[in-house]
């Protein structure tokens, strides 16, 4: 969820140099199926937490951009790479009106709200844990509980707000571990034994394999019930009917992207891969598909439970909020209603033209490279 897949040093440098922009809406050519002319397009500025857009993670945005779903919903989607050097950038930019929708981790979201940045989650991309721990292949660690007293590599010291609650959930005092802020080389630190573990996440595993890094993993979904990165907006916008309508339409486009992906994962991967020139230099189509499938399965967590795409799970959030309050990451126990809402999520799931997305996916023509790829047996979302 956090990093790119060309040379990691290059990507992080690019992220640190500033928030690169990519104008998704300008790439569209689809007509105005819902009676909205191109002149009436409203911009939604979405900001990544990674400092790069060159990853397969955002397939649920690239598909509606390239298939014209956002445009037919009256939206020009602008994707902003953000900055990897400022852990709170994806909420700060929203609060400062430099972006409309952020993609913060739960730790960044709650730390931001606690510090007075008035944002709220309207969409939990994964209603469960997305983060993992990467280990050297010869590591004797077999359980995440064995991380007590170990060295854990991070890309930024700001990622501590992500890992601390995970450790508490495991019964580990965060003060017992040593964090190694290794910048762009944080995964290499684990691979080479300079750290005992490194923070990782679904979607990254296949990308690292594509770079030749040899690692094994403690998969977070097997032992954690905490939530993951969300789409968050300004609280003040949720009191504005026009903004609520705009963001609900944006989420309808996201739902269509997910339904398209579910119906034809290889087509979604081809669309996303084709949108990312730097990624194509270092990741072959099969590994790109594998990376996307790791995340696509996770993105379907709440959908598979019958709660629709993007559901904020109250129980998981309540447990998480208590842990971060006990840790002192927040000065007080944040009220659940200050952190999440499912109001837009429920409407978006009902109103999205899922049937069109599925039909488009089934007739989408694969190129020879993606026609040769294979979807992992048992994949579901």
Language-model segments: which ranges?
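N-terminal export signals
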Residues: 10-33
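Secondary-structure end/capping motifs
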Residues: 241-333
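Secretory targeting signals
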Residues: 1-10
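Periplasmic-binding protein-like
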Residues: 125-135, 209-240, 247, 251
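Short, glycine-/small- and polar/acidic-enriched structural segments
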Residues: 36-192, 196-202, 216-219, 223-225, ...
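Structured segments of extracytoplasmic/periplasmic soluble domains
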Residues: 67, 73, 93, 111-112, ...
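A residue-level marker of the well-folded mature domains of exported/periplasmic proteins
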Residues: 178-181, 189-197, 208-217, 226, ...
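Conserved C-terminal helix/tail region of periplasmic/extracytoplasmic solute-binding proteins
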Residues: 318-381
């Amino acid at each position: 969820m956090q990093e790119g897949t060309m040379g990691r040093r290059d990507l992080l440098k690019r992220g640190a140099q500033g928030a690169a922009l990519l104008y998704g809406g300008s790439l569209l050519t689809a007509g105005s199926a819902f009676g909205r002319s191109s002149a009436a397009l409203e911009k939604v500025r979405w900001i990544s937490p990674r400092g790069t857009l060159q990853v397969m993670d955002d397939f649920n945005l690239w598909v509606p951009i390239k298939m014209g779903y956002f445009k037919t919903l009256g939206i020009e989607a602008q994707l902003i790479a953000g900055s990897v050097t400022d852990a709170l950038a994806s909420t700060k930019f929203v609060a400062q009106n430099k972006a409309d929708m952020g993609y913060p981790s739960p730790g960044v979201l709650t730390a931001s709200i606690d510090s007075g940045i008035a944002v709220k989650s309207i969409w939990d991309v994964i209603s469960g844990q997305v983060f993992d721990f990467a280990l050297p292949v010869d590591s004797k660690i077999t359980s995440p509980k064995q991380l007590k007293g170990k060295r854990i590599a991070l890309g930024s010291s700001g990622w501590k707000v992500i890992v601390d609650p995970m450790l508490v959930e495991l019964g580990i005092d965060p003060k017992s571990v040593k964090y190694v802020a290794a910048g762009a080389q944080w995964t290499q630190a684990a691979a080479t034994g300079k750290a005992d573990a490194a923070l990782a996440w679904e979607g990254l595993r296949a990308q690292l394999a594509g770079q030749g890094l040899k690692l094994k993993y403690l998969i977070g979904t097997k032992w954690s019930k905490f939530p993951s990165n969300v789409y968050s907006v300004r609280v003040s916008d949720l009191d504005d009917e026009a903004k609520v309508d705009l963001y609900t339409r944006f989420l309808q486009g996201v739902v269509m992207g997910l339904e398209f992906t579910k119906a034809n994962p290889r087509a979604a991967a081809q669309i996303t891969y084709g949108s990312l020139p730097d990624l194509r230099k270092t990741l072959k189509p099969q590994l790109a598909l594998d990376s996307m499938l790791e995340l696509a399965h996770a993105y379907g967590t709440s959908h598979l439970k019958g709660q629709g795409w993007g559901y904020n799970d109250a129980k998981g959030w309540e447990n998480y909020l208590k842990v971060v309050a006990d840790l002192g990451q927040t000065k007080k126990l944040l009220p659940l209603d200050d952190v999440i809402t499912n109001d837009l999520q429920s409407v978006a799931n009902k109103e999205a033209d899922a049937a069109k997305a599925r039909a488009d996916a089934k007739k989408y023509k694969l190129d020879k490279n993606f026609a040769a790829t294979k979807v992992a047996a048992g994949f579901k979302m």
